[in-house]
Design a protein with these regions (language model features):
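Helix-start/capping segments and mature chain N-termini
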Residues: 1-67, 81-193
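Short secondary-structure junctions
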Residues: 67-74
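Dinucleotide-binding Rossmann-like beta1-alpha1 core, especially the glycine-rich loop
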Residues: 77
């Protein structure tokens, strides 16, 4: 299987009943493994997708893939569609601009099932393509009134009245998002921007 075949937007991401998880490594160690695998199995249950591997087997497969890749900092993806379970990795190429702020544009769009991370990724992919065409880093999904949901590939937080604020519902309950909420040094509020 080629790298192109495994990218979001390929035929493997055309399955309505598939799911994926994206993780990263730092120095060959998986970051937030447990919550990612919890979400993997939770999503599979919600969309009626049978995963034919145990948590332990998947962890072993992940470690094997990671340890056979030359770069210690990787982006790992698990792709599960009916009768296929694929784990692959690539170099973690973080855009250095993210540390100083990036451009984004708003797109009227909402994930069909924001509570799960499925291969039904058409809404986010279309929004991201619009952002790329406009030389923006990401697209911010919003409703008809301009209220923000989330980024096509990112979480959205803002500080308002000294509180860290984010939407409570209608967004992917991501691992990074949850960690930010749990570790925040300022109070967290749920609201609409």
């Amino acid at each position: 299987m080629t790298q192109e075949e495994l990218q979001i937007g390929s035929e493997y991401f055309a399955f309505e009943s598939g799911l994926y998880e994206t993780m990263r490594t730092m120095n060959y160690k998986l970051v937030f493994l447990e919550p990612h695998l919890e979400r993997l199995f939770s999503t599979a249950q919600k969309i009626n997708l049978k995963i034919h591997h145990s948590l332990e087997e998947i962890t072993e497969m992940l470690e094997k893939v990671i340890n056979n890749f030359p770069d210690p900092n990787q982006r790992i993806r698990i792709l599960s569609v009916p009768n296929k379970f694929i784990i692959y990795t690539s170099h973690l190429n973080l855009n250095p601009l993210i540390y100083n702020g990036v451009n984004a544009l708003t797109v009227e769009a909402k994930r069909d099932t924001p509570e799960v991370k499925t291969t039904n990724y058409h809404v986010c992919l279309s929004a991201l393509n619009k952002a790329i065409e406009a030389n923006s880093f990401d697209a911010i999904l919003c409703d008809k009134e301009g209220n923000i949901y989330e980024g096509s590939k990112s979480n959205i937080f803002w500080v308002k009245e000294g509180r860290l604020t984010t939407r409570e519902k209608d967004v992917l309950p991501g691992t990074t998002r949850r960690t930010i909420i749990e570790k925040s040094q300022i109070s967290v509020h749920y609201g609409i921007l």
